């Protein structure tokens, strides 16, 4: 069994064969899924490297536990204690290499319509050579001339790409909310229990959102300070209430019969999350107390002195952040989700079946399996045509690379950025997250009113 598996992996690394696991008892995997998983693996590998580069804790641990650390840095000409391989400038250079890698493949795979051509073969295989190319791109960033000028220009390129990635992410969320309601509403036509599921989930989502708002009023407002927090909490809460009423208004339901409260519940919960994230990223405020002196107000409890919790919260927050990035990069390129980048159409497929995990349903039909000797079976689902846009897939990962770069280096507060201080306050991060909440609400309101404004374009 070992020899056939090695041959299969060699064909994957050095040829156009799809990658698969060596264990034959593993579930079948589609070629399109295998390819996207491998690119996601590349992406996460570089992302973890960037996190390590921004962590003084990891740098100190390596210095203490690797006996030849100083000698290795000297051999690599990386400066004293590898100073050129850590910090925000190193992250900029590594992410520049990853962005160049995905941008090249985005251009290389333009208008690829089937998997039989040589460009599709390169996209779906030759993983060893692509891994070497990725390493070369990331290393090449350290040899660019005019480093200071490069970092200055690349910072603004990264900010523009990061903003565009945020917009795509928000459009995906709006499309996800519509698809969820559409899928479960279709189930109610043959099983009324789906109505109960809709009502229960809607109630839970609104309850969590309201609870989150109460929590923020408790911890992020103060009678004598934090007036900006009060304004934004009131504005976002009011906007969420307005879009919820708008979603069930007769004028909207005339053009979108499936519009209900589930979509605004999803949007409201996400807006409350963005609001919380923005307020948590805001610089701390202090007021003068007659008894205690200057005290910190409008912060989460762990920021008031319980520093032992900071690393835990930062670690969990970072993990959630990168999971969301990875989900956005992978899901945005499927045929179903690519509709999110267009104006939403309220058309119900005739064969729509309600599913609890509807978002993971493949766009492809059943295909014949191709046996992989000694390993996992692969379904070559792209023989008749591609099931996702190769070019757009790489473009989203290109934008994701820029978003990771800006997030890990704390956007425009990069000089003293550390991964352990990812959740500490800065005005740039605050305004980015607060603006994201408004953009999300705008996108959802637009999908509600545009069929009413342009009815001729949305007729079945």
Curated annotation (Swiss-Prot):
Keywords: Antiviral defense, Cell membrane, Glycoprotein, Immunity, Innate immunity, Lipid biosynthesis, Lipid metabolism, Membrane, Phospholipid biosynthesis, Phospholipid metabolism, Transmembrane, Transmembrane helix. It catalyses: a 1,2-diacyl-sn-glycero-3-phospho-L-serine(in) = a 1,2-diacyl-sn-glycero-3-phospho-L-serine(out); a 1,2-diacyl-sn-glycero-3-phosphocholine(in) = a 1,2-diacyl-sn-glycero-3-phosphocholine(out); a 1,2-diacyl-sn-glycero-3-phosphoethanolamine(in) = a 1,2-diacyl-sn-glycero-3-phosphoethanolamine(out). The chain crosses the membrane at residues 37-57, 90-110, 125-145, 157-177, 198-218, 231-251, 260-280, 312-332, 392-412, 434-454. Residues 1-36, 111-124, 178-197, 252-259, 333-391, 455-460 are extracellular. Residues 58-89, 146-156, 219-230, 281-311, 413-433 are cytoplasmic. Glycans are attached at residues 114, 183. It is found in: Cell membrane. The keyword Flavoprotein does not apply. GO terms for cellular component: membrane; plasma membrane. GO terms for biological process: antiviral innate immune response; phospholipid biosynthetic process; plasma membrane phospholipid scrambling. One of its GO terms (molecular function) is phospholipid scramblase activity. It is a multi-pass membrane protein. The keyword Glycoprotein applies. Belongs to the TDE1 family. Restriction factor required to restrict infectivity of gammaretroviruses: acts by inhibiting an early step of viral infection. Impairs the penetration of the viral particle into the cytoplasm. Non-ATP-dependent, non-specific lipid transporter for phosphatidylserine, phosphatidylcholine, and phosphatidylethanolamine. Functions as a scramblase that flips lipids in both directions across the membrane. Phospholipid scrambling results in gammaretroviral surface exposure of phosphatidylserine and loss of membrane asymmetry, which leads to loss of infectivity. This is Serine incorporator 5. It comes from Danio rerio (Zebrafish).
């Amino acid at each position: 069994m070992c020899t056939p598996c090695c041959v299969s992996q060699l064909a994957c690394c050095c040829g156009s064969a799809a990658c698969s696991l060596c264990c034959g008892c593993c579930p079948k995997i589609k070629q399109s899924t295998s390819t996207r998983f491998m690119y996601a693996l590349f992406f996460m590998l570089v992302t973890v490297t960037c996190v390590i580069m921004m962590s003084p804790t990891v740098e100190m641990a390596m210095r203490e536990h690797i006996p030849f650390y100083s000698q290795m840095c000297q051999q690599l000409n990386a400066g004293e204690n590898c100073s050129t391989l850590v910090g925000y400038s190193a992250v900029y250079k590594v992410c520049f290499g990853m962005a160049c890698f995905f941008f090249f493949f985005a251009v290389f795979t333009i208008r690829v319509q089937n998997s039989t051509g040589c460009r599709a073969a390169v996209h779906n295989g030759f993983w060893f050579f692509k891994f070497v190319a990725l390493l070369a791109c990331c290393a090449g960033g350290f040899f660019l001339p005019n480093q200071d000028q490069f970092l200055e220009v690349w910072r603004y390129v990264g900010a523009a790409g990061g903003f565009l990635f945020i917009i795509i992410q928000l459009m995906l969320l709006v499309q996800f909310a519509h698809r969820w309601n559409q899928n479960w509403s279709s189930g109610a036509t043959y099983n009324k229990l789906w109505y109960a599921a809709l009502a229960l989930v809607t109630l839970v989502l609104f309850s969590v959102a309201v609870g989150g708002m109460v929590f923020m009023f408790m911890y992020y407002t103060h009678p004598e300070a934090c007036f900006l927090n009060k304004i934004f909490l009131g504005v976002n809460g009011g906007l969420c209430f307005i879009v919820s009423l708008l979603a069930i208004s007769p004028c909207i339901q005339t053009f979108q019969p499936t519009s209900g409260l589930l979509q605004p519940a999803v949007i409201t919960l996400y807006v409350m999350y963005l609001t919380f994230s923005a307020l948590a990223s805001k610089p701390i405020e202090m007021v003068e107390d007659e008894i205690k002196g200057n005290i910190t107000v409008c912060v989460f409890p762990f920021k008031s002195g319980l520093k032992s919790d900071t690393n835990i919260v930062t670690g969990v927050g970072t993990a959630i952040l990168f999971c969301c990035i990875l989900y956005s990069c992978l899901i945005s390129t499927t045929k179903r989700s690519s509709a999110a980048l267009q104006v939403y159409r309220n058309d119900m497929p005739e064969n729509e079946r309600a599913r609890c995990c509807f978002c993971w349903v493949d766009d492809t039909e059943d295909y014949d399996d191709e046996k992989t000797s000694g390993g996992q079976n692969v379904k070559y689902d792209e023989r008749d045509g591609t099931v996702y846009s190769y070019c757009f897939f790489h473009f989203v990962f290109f934008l994701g690379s820029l978003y990771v770069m800006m997030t890990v280096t704390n956007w425009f507060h990069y000089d003293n950025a550390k991964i352990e201080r990812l959740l500490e306050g800065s005005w740039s991060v605050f305004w980015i997250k607060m603006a994201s909440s408004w953009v999300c609400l705008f996108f959802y309101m637009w999908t509600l009113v545009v069929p009413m404004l342009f009815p001729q374009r949305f007729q079945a």
